[in-house]
Amino acid sequence: MNSTPVSELSQLIQFTVDFNDLQPELNFSPAEITCILSHERPVLLLITDGTENNAECVTLVGHVLKNKKVIKINVFPMIQSINFVNIFALPIFNITSSLLIQDNCYFKENMDPLRFHQFAYLEKGLGTTPIILYSVKNGDLIVNATVTKITWEKNEFQPLLKNSNDQKLETMYCIFTFNTTYCKYWNVFFASATPICNVEMISEHNLSVYKIEYRSPVLFVFLRYLKVMNSRFCVDECSLRLRLSKPNMQSVALNICMPYFNISEEFKTMEIYFPERMTLTPNHITQINLRGTFENPAAVGLFIPKKSNVLSFPFIWQPRETFRIYVYCRNETFVTEHDIIGHVYFISREQFPHSFHPTAHADCKSKVEAAFNSFRINFLGNDFFSDSLPILTVHPMTDFPYEQIQETENIRHNSMNITPRFKRMQL
């Protein structure tokens, strides 16, 4: 009697691929591993390289796992070696496009504007008081504002940006303020916590809410406007609708809205773009600092690079830290503000309490050691035990017909290649 394959539960999955019998003079295609995994809630599935060698290629893939999914992994052959692939999942936070309102005094930010390409500081006198209408909807405070007679300020340090017509753009800023003393709902909803803000509507194209600061009882709303260089036309009024809500500790919000942070609430990830057009010098490490922080103390950001001609390392992004990344290329490479560097996933700080910026490709691998009734996993400078991780369901291959498996997207496109050259980097 034939038995029906059953699903298995696991918190750590390890695949072993033996290449010891390969002959050096022959060329081989990557070995392909296929498995079917699921979890009842969205989790971050990490496919990591557990091979202890000096290979030029390190596999690191991040994938949000929802429901049942066919996973295909390509393992590149290493002559006369045994390759290990370690797979595990991490709890993942929701990321919201709402702005984290900074509860602090209005001040000039102390930073190097040559590094922070989107630096902006405005004198308080440039602010204007708009017409404000308040309402309440589903427990949130709705603010409808009409701002007129806008005075825009051009910052001295301009990023190199162009629109779809290849026209250069200037970045302009202004502030409008409103006094929460005149809003009878403010203390009802936000007496104990500063709210987050979702911009539900803004009337003008290329206009955005850049950030919001709160110095009790006044809110400072910073507007950012992209204007075609040397154009006479400039928006002098706008209307917008803001939804102010209580912060949710199960999600992560940034304190700034910039085009290099592209948030996908549906896929629980944030795409990271280059801040401007630039030419990367070959064999030279370029440091890029992107303005914007988050403050949820229970979360950290895990950056995973996208596979491209521009090489970078994964790292752990801690709350209130600047997003700082190092990129490198072998040949002169021109990049634009439309080129993706990688993705950030927000995960629990319980597994990753320490900051970590790798300086060698070996630092990006995972190491598994047996521990009492569990396994200790070392990954990106942090240690945690497998029994603290979400339980994955490993399904038999009969759960999916062969044709459906063939059509499943291969996730190797998110793999990252790191060359041994990085071992000599001094960051």
Curated annotation (Swiss-Prot):
A Pfam family matched in the record: Herpes_U55
Superkingdom of origin: Viruses
Record protein name field: Uncharacterized protein U55A
Lineage, uppermost ranks: Viruses, Duplodnaviria, Heunggongvirae, Peploviricota, Herviviricetes
